[in-house]
């Protein structure tokens, strides 16, 4: 509740010992900008003594839930995407910032670097360091060249994905290659990408790659998360030492393959969605849908995600940087 209302967890401190002490003693920043009802509810929920915390029945009767305006219904995508208001700026921008504050997972894409492919004890970073980092950037002269040979520094598949005719690609890989090629078969290069729309999509904004030892884990935008062990899909531990993965919102949506090159991380999902995150200049693209419904969504540093159908780049072309990113993703899949 604290995180939803403020946009940050209540207990954040370094080192960890200080954070654990704050949890035990119930010390956290007081959100003075919230309403009095919201602050009282947070105080009750985060009481140091568990016996003083409200039960579910008492919680539902709290003034925070019983007073004020409550909409009759909400669209399904409101669970994983900030609202898009049809209001002219600057008021529209203010409302959108409020929505992004409530949905903290909807942030600019996180650059992937080869260091993140290392496991613990091998120079790899702490998993917490792989969260969104809107401050990371490189100048134009530091943009890495994506046209060199593809060298995969890490890759993995589901165990069931290993079966198939010798020397042949899996159908989902072939489909992803066709979709990427369709995006590249567009009109002449443009000076900038065409104007698109902001549409909610389900993708994986967070991941951690310890595949050398423990596996690859990711979290979807709706909060669903799971992982892949080095020798197959993740399964719940009976001893209770690991929590059961939260099922994603998409029906049967799971990660089939992940590929990491020196400049990008590619994720291929069971619904055919291709997600590519680039290092250097933070950029992210998601290719989803099938056939004429194919949709390309792009994120660049400091700008919200923009989506457009395949017909738009066919008629208006796309920026050279976008074409370079699509071509790099195509070559990554061709290298397996």
Curated annotation (Swiss-Prot):
Its family?
Belongs to the protein kinase superfamily. Ser/Thr protein kinase family. CDC5/Polo subfamily.
**Keywords (A to Z) from UniProt:** Cell cycle, Cell division, Cytoplasm, Differentiation, Mitosis, Nucleus
Q: What induces it?
A: Down-regulated in primary brain tumors.
Q: Which gene encodes it?
A: PLK5
InterPro entries reported for this sequence? Kinase-like_dom_sf (IPR011009), POLO_box_1 (IPR033701), POLO_box_dom (IPR000959), POLO_box_dom_sf (IPR036947), Prot_kinase_dom (IPR000719)
Q: Where is the POLO box domain?
A: 255-336
Is the Cell division keyword given for this protein?
yes
What is its biological role?
A: Inactive serine/threonine-protein kinase that plays a role in cell cycle progression and neuronal differentiation.
> One cellular component GO annotation, for this chain's record?
nucleus
| MF GO annotations | ATP binding; protein kinase activity
**UniProt note on tissues of expression:** Expressed in the brain, neurons and glial cells. Also expressed in highly differentiated cells, such as the serous acini in the parotid gland, distal and proximal tubules of the kidney, tubules of the seminal gland, Kupffer cells and some hepatocytes in the liver, and some cells in the germinal center of lymph nodes (at protein level).
Domain statement: The truncated protein kinase domain is predicted to be catalytically inactive; has lost the main activatory autophosphorylation site and the conserved key residues involved in phospho-substrate. The C-terminal region (containing the POLO box domain) is sufficient for inducing cell cycle arrest.
**Protein name (Swiss-Prot/TrEMBL):** Inactive serine/threonine-protein kinase PLK5
Give the residue ranges for region: Disordered. 109-135, 224-245
**Main localization of the protein described in the UniProt heading:** nucleus
Q: Where is the Protein kinase domain?
A: 1-65
């Amino acid at each position: 509740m604290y995180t939803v209302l403020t946009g940050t967890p209540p207990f954040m401190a370094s080192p960890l010992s200080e954070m654990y002490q704050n949890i035990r003693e119930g010390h956290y920043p007081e959100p003075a900008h919230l309403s009095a009802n919201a602050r009282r509810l947070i105080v009750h929920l985060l009481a140091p003594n568990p016996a003083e915390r409200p039960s579910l029945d008492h919680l539902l009767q709290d003034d925070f839930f019983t007073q004020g305006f409550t909409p009759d219904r909400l669209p399904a995508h409101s669970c994983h995407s900030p609202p898009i208001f049809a209001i002219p700026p600057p008021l529209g921008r203010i409302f959108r910032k409020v929505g992004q504050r409530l949905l903290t997972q909807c942030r600019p894409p996180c650059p992937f670097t080869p260091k993140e492919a290392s496991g613990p004890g091998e120079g790899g970073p702490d998993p917490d360091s792989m969260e969104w980092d809107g401050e990371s950037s490189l100048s134009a002269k530091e943009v890495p060249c994506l046209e060199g040979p593809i060298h995969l520094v890490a890759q993995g598949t589901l165990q069931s994905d290993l079966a198939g005719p010798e020397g042949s690609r899996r159908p989902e890989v072939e489909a992803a290659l066709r979709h990427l090629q369709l995006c590249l078969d567009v009109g002449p290069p443009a000076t900038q990408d065409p104007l698109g729309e902001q549409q909610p999509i389900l993708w994986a904004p967070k991941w951690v790659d310890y595949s050398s030892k423990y596996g690859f884990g990711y979290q979807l935008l709706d909060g669903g998360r799971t992982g892949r062990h080095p020798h197959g899909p993740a399964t719940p531990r009976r001893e209770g030492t690991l929590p059961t993965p939260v099922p994603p919102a998409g029906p049967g949506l799971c990660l089939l393959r992940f590929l990491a090159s020196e400049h990008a991380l590619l994720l291929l999902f069971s619904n055919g969605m291709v997600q590519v995150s680039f290092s250097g200049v933070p950029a992210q693209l998601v290719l989803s849908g099938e056939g004429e419904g194919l949709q390309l969504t792009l994120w660049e540093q400091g700008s919200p995600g923009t989506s457009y159908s395949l017909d738009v780049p066919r008629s208006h072309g796309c920026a050279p940087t976008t074409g370079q990113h699509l071509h790099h993703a195509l070559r990554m899949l061709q290298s397996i």
